[in-house]
Curated annotation (Swiss-Prot):
The modification N2-acetylarginine is found at residue 35. GO terms for molecular function: chlorophyll binding; metal ion binding. Chlorophyll b 4 binds at residues 155, 166. Chlorophyll a 5 binds at residues 203, 221. Chlorophyll b 5 binds at residue 155. This is Chlorophyll a-b binding protein 2, chloroplastic. The N-terminus of the protein extends into the stroma where it is involved with adhesion of granal membranes and post-translational modifications; both are believed to mediate the distribution of excitation energy between photosystems I and II. Its main location: plastid. Residues 1-34 form a transit peptide. The lineage of its organism: Eukaryota, Viridiplantae, Streptophyta, Embryophyta, Tracheophyta. One of its GO terms (cellular component) is chloroplast thylakoid membrane. Chlorophyll a 6 binds at residues 236, 245. The chain crosses the membrane at residues 90-110, 142-162, 210-230. It comes from Glycine max (Soybean).
Amino acid sequence: MAASTMALSSSSLAGQAMKLAPSTPELGVGRVSMRKTAPKTVSSGSPWYGPDRVKYLGPFSGEAPSYLTGEFHGLSADPETFAKNRELEVIHSRWAMLGALGCVFPELLARNGVKFGEAVWFKAGSQIFSEGGLDYLGNPSLIHAQSILAIWATQVILMGAVEGYRIAGGPLGEVTDPIYPGGSFDPLGLADDPEALAELKVKELKNGRLAMFSMFGFFVQAIVTGKGPLENLADHLADPVNNNAWAYATKLCPGK
């Protein structure tokens, strides 16, 4: 009987795939199903986090107030005053760029073996008060200066003539822009292209502002350390812990 039943079962299942296990495992009378659930986003409940966080406090918004234009208050309110301040800024920027180069370049040459007298910028001019006077570039046959009054008068005459020429617009008064007069003041023709000139104006102003800050730093270094900018830089690189602005500031505190 059992043998015949197994034979019938085998014949009836011939050619069919046998299902050895149910698709869903059964434990007792219940079913266990495996589901893949996505993690739920849990809100922190804090107003300082998330995409909807508070970015500005109080009545402020993401837009800057109309009166914040990046300029000092009141200095650009009057167009004439602004034009005058811009002219002064550009002129001081140019002098600062020349001065910064004059402070660094002689010291750089001296550190590389070039001998031309005193290389530190604030010590070079004081040589005129010495007994032998001041030799330009360390060469007595070039310019041998012994009178500070003569140097002052010469500088006033030369600089005054150039500045007067610039402000007056040249000998014929044809120059309309005293800051960028062009002509003889632009021998390379950099102002021929208006777009290039506009870009150069911005670069000149940015580099000039940096040079003015650099000159201020050179002044402070000379007063505090009594050394030139490159010597101060070398000392800082050799011992950053003991040669920095904070270390010198603490030495100047009362009671030190």
